[in-house]
């Protein structure tokens, strides 16, 4: 998948699940299942419920995403 094809949206973490999975509520009200990107995992950045995050989504599956940034 090319980098141009991703959809970036902001959302809020609603729930944490096992295996570094999170339920994220997007700005438009939809809820998706998101996982943590490699750089966040590598740098041990903690993500908790209530955090604002940026999520990358594939245009082919709009129910899953990858958390790429946690706002301070």
From Swiss-Prot:
Coiled coil: none annotated. Residues 1-72 form the S1-like domain. The keyword Protein biosynthesis applies. InterPro entries: NA-bd_OB-fold, RNA-binding_domain_S1_IF1, S1_domain, TIF_IF1. It comes from the Bacteria. It is found in: Cytoplasm. Its main location: cytoplasm. Pfam families: eIF-1a. Keywords: Cytoplasm, Initiation factor, Protein biosynthesis, RNA-binding, rRNA-binding. GO terms for molecular function: ribosome binding; rRNA binding; translation initiation factor activity. GO terms for cellular component: cytosol. CDD domains: S1_IF1. The keyword Disulfide bond does not apply. One of the essential components for the initiation of protein synthesis. Stabilizes the binding of IF-2 and IF-3 on the 30S subunit to which N-formylmethionyl-tRNA(fMet) subsequently binds. Helps modulate mRNA selection, yielding the 30S pre-initiation complex (PIC). Upon addition of the 50S ribosomal subunit IF-1, IF-2 and IF-3 are released leaving the mature 70S translation initiation complex. Component of the 30S ribosomal translation pre-initiation complex which assembles on the 30S ribosome in the order IF-2 and IF-3, IF-1 and N-formylmethionyl-tRNA(fMet); mRNA recruitment can occur at any time during PIC assembly. Belongs to the IF-1 family. NCBIfam families: infA. This is Translation initiation factor IF-1.
